[in-house]
């Protein structure tokens, strides 16, 4: 029971950071805040025994650092995407449900490395990522994750719509 509480508290902190990241205007700012949240999520997922998600979160930190370096070689981008998939599959202890974080990370990693100067599209891709993680959270008893993912989804939608007007 203590593991569930700690994991849920980590999710609460991570989601607060993600909500905050959706208010940022540049890719560098968005990814910096998301790196902190990825570390917190990875730690929380260990407590909740969602190991494929932990692997995705920790690889995601490296991915974001590389993504903010405009001079990083393209092979490094694709290597990190492949590393995320491989590590997720190795640490998947939940069958199909354990694939959700892998798919989410794959989708968002490709977005980060291929989307240039389109913060709206990056936020939409992040929205898809958060939705997949919300479903995953249901299965690992991360109740805070489900609730706060829903809040982040709403926050992202508001910021995407606000940018339109």
Region locations from a protein language model:
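Alpha-helical membrane-protein topology signature
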Residues: 1-165
